[in-house]
UniProtKB/Swiss-Prot annotation:
Coiled-coil features, chain-numbered ranges: none
Organism: Bacillus subtilis (strain 168)
Processing and modification events after translation: Phosphorylated by YbdK.
Main location: cytoplasm
GO function terms (MF aspect): phosphorelay response regulator activity; transcription cis-regulatory region binding
Record-level GO BP terms: regulation of DNA-templated transcription
Gene name in the database record: ybdJ
Keywords of the record: Cytoplasm, DNA-binding, Phosphoprotein, Transcription, Transcription regulation, Two-component regulatory system
Name of the protein: Uncharacterized transcriptional regulatory protein YbdJ
Modified residues (4-aspartylphosphate): 52
Function: Member of the two-component regulatory system YbdK/YbdJ.
Lineage, uppermost ranks: Bacteria, Bacillati, Bacillota, Bacilli, Bacillales
Top-level lineage group: Bacteria
GO cellular component annotations of the record: cytosol; protein-DNA complex
Amino acid sequence: MKGYRILIVEDDVMIGDLLQKILQREGYRVIWKTDGADVLSVIQKVDLVIMDVMLPGEDGYQMSAKIKKLGLGIPVIFLSARNDMDSKLQGLQIGEDYMVKPFDPRELLLRMRNMLEHHYGTFTQIKHLYIDAVTKKVFNESLHDEVLFTAIERKIFFYLYENRDSILTKEHFFEYLWQLEDRNPNIVNVHIKKIRAKINDQAGEMIENIYGEGYRLNTVVKK
């Protein structure tokens, strides 16, 4: 589950700081806001929201309603000191989960993992990319930022992915991409360059050019 982007909206500095450290230690990427003022400006960059109900200004329920209107399908876990049934039911009607403070971080992590698996399924991650080999979709940074490949770019990328960590020569590409009647060797280079730009790999760390041989999609990228 590592690599998912989590937005924490919590005005209690002690709780917010603790949550941020715990989630980062588990491999999550965290954005922390102390109120809902600019939540909507970052919401498209995250995969899950952990939100306090009692916030300065608009409360968590109001902010969650605004998030849902965007139609992004981002799950929300509410945190609240209110333990009465009416508060719990209200939270569960608006968000996906409701946890009462104080809570056990281990329980929160388990609920988060289950929620992320339920909403997003299982993706393969390479550096900042999320790759779904079933739907043939690729996402940059967040699961709400799909890479918009052309048909030929998608075919090339997933050919590399299916043969990841192996070198594919230009002849391999020509044989696989039968619709490429133009056997100009540069045609492969052109498409690879466009793919790299779309996946933020201009340096060629993920899709590496092996001089004199071909290209390789690296699953382990050197830092």
